Each structure stands twice: as C-alpha cells, then as structure tokens.
C-alpha cells in the first residue's frame, strides 16, 4: 500500500486503501461538482444547491409538522427554502474568513483553485442559493403535477 505523506511527514498521511484508491471511487469523486474540472465556482454551487434543494423538499413535505394537512406541500416548500437560506448563510460566513488552499489527497489530487479563495466560496454560496431554491421549486412543482396526495396517503 502507498502512503501519501503530508508536507513530507509520514506521520500525517493518507493510506491508499482499495476503497479510496480504486478506479471506480476515483472516477466517482472526480466527477462530483466540487472536483470536476472546467466548472466555475458559481456553477459548482448551482449543481450542489440543486441536488440539496431537490432532496430537502421531500422530508419537509411528507414528515414535517403539517404532514396531515392540506398545507403540507406549501410547508415543505417554505421549510426547504428556509433550510437552503440557512445553509447559504453558513457558506457565506465560511467565505468571509481567511480560506486556505484545500489539501490535496489521494482521491482529490487536483483541487480547484476557486475553492481556495474567499471570492470563490462567495460565488459558490450565491450559486448554491439559486440552485437550492430552484431545486426546491422543481420538486414542489413535480409533486403538484403528480399524484402527491395518493403517495402521502400511502406513506401516512
């Protein structure tokens, strides 16, 4: 097994295991929006936000406190947008502090440069909010167009 040393110190390193160094896991991780080459910070945030907004809507709509009322879908929409807003504020706070260059590891040897600056993280946060809100609205509209009441009766 290979040991990837951190700053020349073998005590602080990353052990190459079959999980983190296999071609399948490397291909998967390198194709995630955070590590994909050629994307701007705004586009990275947009893709990550869309995924988060889309999957946050369902639990709030089906399992939220308004689950047995006619306002469950609207409550899920507003709750998920509020959660996306809170996450965007957290990303903006992270962008406001001194951000160092991300550490290169065995699975992510080519970390994008824009994730190492405050401006890049600010653009990521902006894209995250737009994408997250869009993902929530898309999930809401998708559930309104389909037979959401039938699904809710089956699950509830």
From Swiss-Prot:
SUPFAM superfamilies: Photosystem I reaction center subunit XI, PsaL. It is a multi-pass membrane protein. The keyword Transmembrane helix applies. GO terms for cellular component: photosystem I reaction center; plasma membrane-derived thylakoid membrane. It is found in: Cellular thylakoid membrane. Its main location: membrane. Pfam families: PsaL. Disulfide bonds: none annotated. Belongs to the PsaL family. HAMAP family: PSI_PsaL. This is Photosystem I reaction center subunit XI.
């Amino acid at each position: 097994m290979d040991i990837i040393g951190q700053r020349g110190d073998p005590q602080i390193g990353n052990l190459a295991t079959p999980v983190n160094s296999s071609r399948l896991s490397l291909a998967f991780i390198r194709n995630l929006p955070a590590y994909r080459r050629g994307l701007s910070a705004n586009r990275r945030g947009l893709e990550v936000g869309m995924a988060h907004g889309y999957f946050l809507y369902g639990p709030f709509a089906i399992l939220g406190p308004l689950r047995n009322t006619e306002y469950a879908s609207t409550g899920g929409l507003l709750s998920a947008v509020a959660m996306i807003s809170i996450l965007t504020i957290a990303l903006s706070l992270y962008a406001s502090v001194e951000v160092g260059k991300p550490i290169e590891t065995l699975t992510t040897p080519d970390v994008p440069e824009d994730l190492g600056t405050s401006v890049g993280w600010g653009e990521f946060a902006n894209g995250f909010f737009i994408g997250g809100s869009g993902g929530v609205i898309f999930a809401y509209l998708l559930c309104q167009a389909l037979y959401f009441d039938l699904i809710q009766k089956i699950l509830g």
